[in-house]
């Protein structure tokens, strides 16, 4: 059975009930996304950075599930890519790969600490697509708060 966005969000939420784990996710999920895009932006394929290609595939995934979620993810992705571009312009002489990688690792350690507190394995152990659902899960809370149906 194909899952809709509500089923994905609900299934993801099962292992994200603990308030501390939720708070950790609000910090670590955006950091993981940002640092992953930062790392991917350093990889160029025919003068196109890999982050753009990965975002295109991710947005297609979101669009198949929910137009409002895909719009939110587009805005977040574009904002993060813009910030990454700005950082890369400012710090040409600094090896950003090490900063991105260290932050990426620290954010993942935070995620695993949150799941240890939760007493549940991360959702992506069940299905790798949950790695894309984490950011959408956060957006769903924002949308509910401001009354946007997704």
Question: Where would I find each of the regions flagged by the language model?
Answer:
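Membrane interfacial helix-start motif at the N-side
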Residues: 9-30, 36-40, 59-69, 117, ...
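Alpha-helical transmembrane segments of multi-pass membrane proteins
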Residues: 58-62, 81, 103-111
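Membrane-proximal soluble regions of multi-pass membrane proteins
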Residues: 1-15, 19-20, 116-150
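Hydrophobic alpha-helical transmembrane segments
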Residues: 52-56, 70-75, 97-102
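Cytoplasmic-side transmembrane-helix entry/capping segments in multi-pass membrane proteins
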Residues: 71-79, 126-128
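Hydrophobic, membrane-inserted alpha-helices
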Residues: 31-37, 53-61, 77-84
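Membrane-interface helix caps and helix-loop-helix hairpins in membrane proteins
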Residues: 19, 45, 63-71, 87-94, ...
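Helix-coil boundary and interhelical linker segments in multi-pass alpha-helical membrane proteins
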Residues: 37-51, 82-100
């Amino acid at each position: 059975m194909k899952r809709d966005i509500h089923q994905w969000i609900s299934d993801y939420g099962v292992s994200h009930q603990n308030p501390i784990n939720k708070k950790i996710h609000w910090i670590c999920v955006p950091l993981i996304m940002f640092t992953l895009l930062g790392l991917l932006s350093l990889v160029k394929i025919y003068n196109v950075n890999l982050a753009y290609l990965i975002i295109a595939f991710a947005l297609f995934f979101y669009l198949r599930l929910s137009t409002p979620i895909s719009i939110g993810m587009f805005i977040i992705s574009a904002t993060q890519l813009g910030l990454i571009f700005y950082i890369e312009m400012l710090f040409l002489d600094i090896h950003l790969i090490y900063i991105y990688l260290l932050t990426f690792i620290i954010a993942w350690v935070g995620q695993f600490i949150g799941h240890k507190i939760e007493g549940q394995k991360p959702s992506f152990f069940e299905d790798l697509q949950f790695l894309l659902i984490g950011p959408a899960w956060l957006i769903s809370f924002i949308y509910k708060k401001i009354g946007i149906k997704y």
